[in-house]
Amino acid sequence: MSELFNVSVIVPIYNAESYLKRCIDVLLKQDFNKSFEIIMVDDASTDNSQNIIKKQNSPLIKLYSLPSNTGPSAARNIGLKIAKGDYVFFLDADDTISTSTLKTLYSHAKENDFDLVFGDIKRIENSQNQRENIF
């Protein structure tokens, strides 16, 4: 019998080696006392992305490699087919979140019987200066 999770985090990846370590680190540091899996769908990267993921050696991370580039939407859809979580969280490889994001969104969804929750989106330049609220 396969393991079920409270949350499946789906990360589509294409040539993201310069961002990937930061993305993985923040996911592995989540202050979340429920079970979750990190599904990384590599969309035929030609850089070092797969090696960066493999070096993490975490049982939470599941790497799926696509033979050809199909785009981020297709990679997300493949992640959805693989996901075993009650809830799904999408994160792009060049994004970052706070270490309490999964806990906050999951708690809010469960306590209010919501099917969908989301947080604010802010654009941050490389200098880490807040640029603007997007959503």
Regions found by a protein language model. Name each.
Residues 1-135:
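Nucleotide-sugar donor-binding/catalytic module of glycosyltransferases
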